[in-house]
Amino acid sequence: MSKKLPVGIQVYGLRDLLENTPENFKNVMEQVKALGYDGVELAGLYGLTPEYVKEVLDEVGLVPISAHVAFAEMMEDLDTIIADYKKIGVQYLVMPYMAEEYRPVNPEGFQKFLPMLNEVGKKIHDAGMTFLYHNHDFEFVKMEDGQWGYDVMFASIPHDNLMP
């Protein structure tokens, strides 16, 4: 007998359906579950409390796997972000995007960015969560020394503090 592999959906793709009202969030999550999904990767709290998000996901039967959180938001109030997503039951916080000034095509900005990224990752790891990076094409450019920006990023930051 084969075992069913759980399937999750990235809620970012449904963002236009999510308003800052509990009714829409619950309705969308019910529809996600009805489509056969087992879990979700959140992309913000949509103006809702973490307690309400957890309540809806528990009621509907969806596992909160991870959450995309903008790096700028993490830099502003990481403690609250960690606390909120831990209340929901999220294990993985994902940085979904790298601002242009920090990309490998801007070596000075990229080198400034790496210690900040490591600091955020360490704090997330110390809180018992895992920090992930959602890549795009702009990390895959060669630096002046011939190394790929993506490789430099992951070689510069301990694996406990950042995972691909």
List each language-model region with its residue ranges.
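A short acidic, helix-capping loop that chelates divalent metal ions and anchors anionic groups
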Residues: 13-17, 101-106, 139-142
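Conserved beta-strand edge residues that scaffold enzyme active sites
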Residues: 46-47, 71, 99-100, 137-139
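Surface-exposed, active-site-proximal loop segments in enzymatic domains
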Residues: 76-79, 84, 97-111
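CE4/NodB-like, metal-dependent polysaccharide N-deacetylase domain
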Residues: 34, 83-95, 112, 116-128
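Acidic/histidine-rich catalytic cores of soluble enzymes
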Residues: 40, 124-164
